[in-house]
Amino acid sequence: MPIITLPDGSQRHFDNPVSTLEVAQSIGPGLAKATIAGRVNGARVDACDLIEHDASLEIITTKDEVDGLEIVRHSCAHLLGHALKQLYPNAKMAIGPTIDSGFYYDIDLEQSLSQEDLEKIEARMVELAKTKYAVVKKKVSWQEARDTFESRGESYKMEILDENVARDDRPGLYHHEEYIDMCRGPHVPHMGFCQNFKLLNIAGAYWRGNSDNKMLQRIYGTAFHDKKALQAHLTRLEEAAKRDHRKIGKQLDLFHMQQEAPGMVFWHHNGWSIFRDLEIFIRQKLNEYGYQEVKGPLMMDRVLWERSGHWDKYADAMFTTSSENREYAIKPMNCPGHIQIFNQGLKSYRDLPLRMAEFGSCHRNEPSGSLHGIMRVRGFTQDDAHIFCTEDQIQQEVTSCIKMVYDTYTTFGFQNIVVKLSTRPEKRVGSDEIWDKSEQALIDSLKAMDIPFEIQEGEGAFYGPKIEFTLYDCLDRAWQCGTVQLDFNLPTRLGATYVGESNERLIPVMIHRAILGSLERFIGILIEEYAGFFPTWLAPEQAVVVNITDKQADYAHEVAQKLQKCGIRAKADLRNEKIGFKIREHTLKRVPYMLVCGDQEMEAGEIAVRTRKGKDLGKFKLDDFIAHIQAEIASRKLNLEE
């Protein structure tokens, strides 16, 4: 007789084992109709799974925008598999998980699928979903599952069973009419819940993410509970496509990538201008917050990476080379090098905290399939810093880091920042005392600044707790950028010590701190956030002077020269083209200000000022405009609306 406790504290008694769906039916037909799955004692289960003992139950319905939506999307992946096998019986199914905002399925198919094929597959999915067929779950033995997939020629499913499922386990097989898939679940009870979906695109993906394996075809899709939410998401995707940093990067001549240097950025003059302005801005912040800037070597001996522990855990992601019988690794991160600098010379407690920052050129051997413009690269620059401090200084230093993070992000216009605090995992280094002290210091720092945060229990690194800062952009996309990470491990491994007040040797606490993360990635985020309409202080070209006829050419040239002498990135466009053509061209280049010189302006020593959004600011004396734009640049005003 299971007793089921509901979220409101009420209890329901049943004479026999009962399913989530049956509990919902006992409450009311409306709830039963909306029931997707259940959460029994915190664990998700299918709506049909029987609850045999007393338990707490949360009923997952179509109103659940987290678990409910994830289950719908996962079931849509199975629906995609169902449609694919009907249309392409020889296709071999690999995996079909959910991802942020959607799902995908990897398949092995001899023919290359096109966009037209995608439309045909989606149409078949619509046909199948309209029937609202029941999804039947069967728990079977390992051998029965393997025999099922062997009889169907599903070699990838067999490999998953052989390598990832214990022989005494009972895998779940989900029957979608004649199609069978294997999954932990849960899934929707019927396809009536999978009515609002869209297939998006096709990409290549190596089986198990290993380039030594076969390249499969990956079909991406998305799904929502209702048409309105789906359409809103598709609209966001359309806007994101318009803002794609790769597309805008080409339009504005910022950078390019090429096959001979995968994952490495070729910065053009315009893009490098943005990069340098970011460096200047961060350097000002470093000075303001008391950091010293350093520069470590690009490449260090394998011995050092072995001592740091990176060689054992990170070797596959490191680029290596050898010379004179010594093996070297190009650095994937800056921290071991910073400890080498710290270790030069005796340090006293009076020297702490020591804040060390670097624009470190790092390289990581990311899989080729994961590379994405300048957002995911192999060569990147970290705005990295490491703070060496005592245990008693942790809170003040973390508070300073958090202030610097918010000071930086708000300058770029990011207001929606989600903060997560990850606490100690089961396997860790350091005493409970230092973990207690450190976690409390992070909590106190966030609370003192009135910053809401989410605690992720057990999600910290083995060497210390951390705070992560995730930005949400204008399209509500999440970008994890900033990190404040405590480290009780690396200083010990690499022999960092200082002399304490009692003349004893002590090991400093090390705080890893990144704000932008990778400058390359952050520039990509800014390109898409601003759609290329950079604030004037970041714009590669801040003003362009255009003449109406040849008669004003000399005057326009003089205006441009004066702007340049005042530190403004400006040029004169003296081409023999119509004024409308020139203004349109520079508008497309997102130049913040267009300064028009006609006869009247030339005679009065003025300029007619127009913004890239088409706003007429009227006529300015040149000195007045220079003062205006200099103030705008100096204050780093966003001027996105103009």
Curated annotation (Swiss-Prot):
Q: Which InterPro entries match?
A: aa-tRNA-synt_IIb (IPR002314), aa-tRNA-synth_II (IPR006195), aa-tRNA-synth_II/BPL/LPL (IPR045864), Anticodon-bd (IPR004154), Anticodon-bd_dom_sf (IPR036621), Beta-grasp_dom_sf (IPR012675), TGS (IPR004095), TGS-like (IPR012676)
Predominantly, its location class is cytoplasm
Q: Its Enzyme Commission number?
A: 6.1.1.3
Ranges for region Catalytic: 244-535
| Cofactors, names only | Zn(2+)
Q: Sorted alphabetically, which keywords does the UniProt record give?
A: Aminoacyl-tRNA synthetase, ATP-binding, Cytoplasm, Ligase, Metal-binding, Nucleotide-binding, Protein biosynthesis, RNA-binding, tRNA-binding, Zinc
- What subcellular locations does the record give? Cytoplasm
Q: Which residues bind Zn(2+)?
A: 335, 386, 512
Subunit info here reads:
Homodimer.
Pfam families from the UniProt entry:
HGTP_anticodon, TGS, tRNA-synt_2b, tRNA_SAD
What is this protein's record name? Threonine--tRNA ligase
Report the co-factor binding details.
Answer: Binds 1 zinc ion per subunit.
